[in-house]
A protein has these predicted regions:
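Bacterial N-terminal signal peptides
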Residues: 9-17
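Bacterial N-terminal signal peptides that target proteins for export
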Residues: 1-8
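Acidic, polar-rich low-complexity tracts and alpha-helical solenoid repeat scaffolds
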Residues: 2, 18-189
């Protein structure tokens, strides 16, 4: 009985050694042209998925394009498109995350005006009314002020000024809401 186990053990050991023996190995090289083609394909797939309405897959493809070739001109574009994909379907927190990552990675990119505008719009779209928290309101105003101060010659500056006027009206409504509350409670300041 014991010898049967020894023979079985030896056969298994030989099979293991034989399967691990050196065979001709195929080493695949990643050619830069292939990487650029993969990056381009990922960007195109992301764009098609965005048009179809599958924003999660689109954002994944845009992020994939950015990761495949981070030094290309398409990397920053892919990061913005991933954020836009989330924004287009009201995934504002995901869009904010993508845009903050974009600003860390590409602080001096030519599309920063649009990225600030998109970030401002993400915060702006989360404004409910004057009775709610002011954080998204103030964050939105901050982004629009950056556009006016740093990118005043872009087409986004006009819209940013308009949005700031609307935000100021909401802030004034908030002050009126607070004043009415204290008047109703007869809590004179």
């Amino acid at each position: 009985m014991c010898s049967k186990f020894k023979i079985l053990f030896i056969l298994i050991a030989l099979l293991f050694v034989w399967s691990c023996a050196d065979k001709e190995k195929k080493i695949s090289k990643i050619v830069e042209a292939d990487m650029e083609m993969q990056m381009s394909n990922a960007y195109k797939e992301g764009y098609l998925e965005l048009q179809r309405g599958d924003v999660l897959l689109a954002a994944k493809k845009f992020n994939e394009a950015e990761l495949l070739f981070p030094q290309s001109i398409w990397a920053a574009e892919s990061a913005i498109m991933a954020a836009y994909a989330y924004y287009s379907q009201n995934y504002y927190s995901d869009a904010v995350y993508e845009l903050e990552r974009y600003f860390e990675t590409y602080p001096n990119h030519k599309d920063n005006a649009y990225a600030h505008f998109l970030l401002g719009m993400c915060f702006y779209e989360q404004i409910v009314d004057e009775k709610k928290d002011l954080k998204s309101l103030l964050d939105s105003k901050k982004q629009f002020e950056i556009i006016i101060n740093e990118f005043s010659s872009t087409e986004f500056a006009v819209d940013a000024k308009f949005k700031i006027n609307l935000i100021d009206e909401i802030l004034a409504a908030k002050e009126m809401y607070i004043a009415r509350y204290y008047l109703d409670k007869t809590k004179w300041i």
